């Protein structure tokens, strides 16, 4: 049985293992059979026999299968540890007395670490009290041509991300994170359904890119002879559902944005959007906090998130809120209002060294947000609702009911990153058209994140939409908030640059 000493040994390991595969085929022994008679999972046996006395025979014959992650071969008795997908492990014993010399020699010659094998035999406990299957026969189920990483060397992040399948095999934490994500998604759906929300599906391919300020991925439909866009948000279609009479709807699905990738951003990401008729952004902020806390309880088991530095992050209790313009004014030491000219904001940005592209037609609203992010956003550690945004950067949001020049929008910040956003939705079709036209002018001036004018959406609003609040929350970022991990660790298969080979 072979095991790699270093990554440099892999080509030789591959050659040796491939030769074993060819020999098995030549001998008429299938290294990749279509089926084996597995009767129990390893976890089931662990559960059925939690505390057998040492050197006990149960008389139960079983068939088990798993990946060989440890092996020790001696004269007439070989030991191996099998592992199955959920991480459960069990010892198997290959004995000369039970299988004979030919089968014992074949085990020693044919089986490598990483192979998946089937073992049939009796459930026993060894002399040391280890629950085991004493084989009376065995079979290779899948011959591994590549060796597993060396057990005592930790996988680096690049390998974990590029070869998540290896990460899942060797690292229990990777399997835990994958299961936590599934549990989080299930808990989100459950919490919304308890509140009467209906899950719907809306188009991934759209004829217009709308619903968010972001650069889209563009593709071409040969059948329609037209460009289509991978959606950047489902918002405009979900609002059509509200117009049609679905008072509480949500969608949990993929969005795509042709932008940067870093520790908090991914070009492809899972997004939750909700819309609730007859609610305001105050209502959706409350629902969002309750939702996150309920999901933490159900899927993670705690509202205190352990961080890499050994501290904890508390998601419990009420969360603070602040307003964008007053908090920016306080950080700068001078008053900034919706009437502050863009020229002054550019001067402040230059003075502070804030890098803002000058060729994208940014006006007052975008400059305020960039300055706020630089001076305030990067300091927000505790869960915080940031409220009341500039009009021109929130074209789908209702004007504030009492503050001139801002909209009823909040962003939720957790540990310095934006986790969710919520609006009191703009439902006046005339004002919405004016906002879209302003976005079109921004696009013409070079803003590649400006929204397109969607005539069909405007037509829907013209039929009448009830007062509505909407929210959006990235599931990947929710996992970050609940686990303390980076976005690439919370995504099972994140996008990575291809190797040249």
From Swiss-Prot:
Its EC number is 6.1.1.6. GO terms for biological process: lysyl-tRNA aminoacylation. This is Lysine--tRNA ligase. Pfam families: tRNA-synt_2, tRNA_anti-codon. It comes from the Bacteria. It is an enzyme of class 6 (ligase). It is found in: Cytoplasm. It comes from Mycolicibacterium gilvum (strain PYR-GCK) (Mycobacterium gilvum (strain PYR-GCK)). It catalyses: tRNA(Lys) + L-lysine + ATP = L-lysyl-tRNA(Lys) + AMP + diphosphate. NCBIfam families: lysS_bact, PRK00484.1. Gene3D superfamilies: Bira Bifunctional Protein, Domain 2, Nucleic acid-binding proteins. The keyword Hydrolase does not apply. Signal peptide: none annotated. Mg(2+) 2 binds at residue 418. One of its GO terms (molecular function) is magnesium ion binding. Belongs to the class-II aminoacyl-tRNA synthetase family. Binds 3 Mg(2+) ions per subunit. Mg(2+) 1 binds at residues 411, 418. Homodimer. Its cofactor is Mg(2+). Disulfide bonds: none annotated. Keywords: Aminoacyl-tRNA synthetase, ATP-binding, Cytoplasm, Ligase, Magnesium, Metal-binding, Nucleotide-binding, Protein biosynthesis. One of its GO terms (cellular component) is cytosol. The keyword Magnesium applies.
């Amino acid at each position: 049985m072979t095991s790699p000493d270093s990554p440099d040994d892999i080509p030789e390991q591959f050659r040796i293992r491939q030769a074993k595969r060819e020999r098995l085929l030549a001998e008429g022994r299938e290294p990749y059979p279509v089926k084996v008679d597995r009767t129990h999972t390893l976890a089931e046996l662990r559960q059925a026999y939690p505390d057998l006395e040492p050197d006990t025979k149960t008389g139960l014959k079983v068939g088990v299968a798993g990946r060989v992650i440890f092996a020790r071969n001696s004269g007439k008795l070989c030991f191996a540890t099998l592992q199955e997908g959920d991480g459960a492990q069990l010892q198997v014993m290959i004995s000369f007395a039970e299988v004979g010399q030919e089968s014992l020699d074949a085990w020693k010659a044919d089986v490598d670490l990483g192979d998946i094998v089937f073992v049939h035999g009796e459930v026993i406990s060894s002399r040391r009290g280890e629950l085991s299957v004493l084989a009376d026969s065995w079979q290779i189920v899948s011959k591994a041509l590549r060796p597993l990483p060396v057990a005592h060397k930790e996988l680096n992040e690049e390998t974990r991300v590029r070869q998540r399948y290896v990460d899942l095999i060797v690292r229990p934490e990777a399997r835990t994170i994958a299961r936590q994500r599934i549990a989080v998604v299930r808990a989100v759906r459950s919490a919304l359904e308890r509140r009467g929300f209906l899950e719907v599906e809306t188009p991934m391919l759209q004829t217009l890119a709308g619903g968010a300020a972001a650069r889209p991925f563009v593709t071409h439909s040969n059948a329609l002879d037209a460009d289509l866009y991978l959606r950047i948000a489902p918002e405009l279609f979900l609002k059509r559902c509200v117009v049609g009479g679905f008072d509480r709807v949500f969608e949990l699905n993929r969005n795509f944005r042709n932008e940067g990738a870093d520790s908090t951003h991914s070009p492809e990401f899972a997004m939750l959007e909700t819309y609730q008729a007859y609610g305001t952004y105050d209502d959706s902020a409350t629902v969002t906090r309750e939702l996150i806390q309920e999901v933490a309880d159900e899927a993670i088991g705690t509202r205190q998130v352990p961080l890499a530095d050994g501290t904890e992050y508390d998601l419990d209790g009420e969360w603070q809120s602040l307003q964008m313009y007053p908090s920016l004014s306080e950080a700068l030491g001078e008053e900034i209002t919706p009437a502050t000219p863009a020229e002054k904001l550019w001067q402040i940005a230059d003075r502070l060294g804030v890098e803002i592209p000058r060729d994208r037609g940014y006006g007052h609203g975008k400059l305020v947000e960039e300055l706020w992010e630089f001076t305030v956003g990067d300091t927000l550690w505790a869960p915080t609702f940031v409220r009341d945004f500039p009009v021109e950067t929130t074209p789908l949001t209702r004007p504030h009911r009492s503050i001139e020049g801002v909209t009823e929008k909040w962003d939720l910040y957790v540990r310095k990153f934006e986790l969710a956003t919520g609006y009191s939705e703009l439902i006046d079709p005339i004002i919405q058209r004016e906002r879209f036209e302003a976005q079109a002018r921004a696009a013409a001036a070079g803003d590649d994140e400006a929204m397109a004018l969607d005539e069909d959406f405007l037509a829907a609003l013209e039929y009448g939409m009830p007062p509505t609040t909407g929210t959006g929350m990235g599931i990947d970022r929710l996992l970050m908030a609940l686990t303390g991990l980076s976005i690439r660790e919370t995504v099972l298969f994140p996008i990575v640059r291809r190797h040249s080979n």
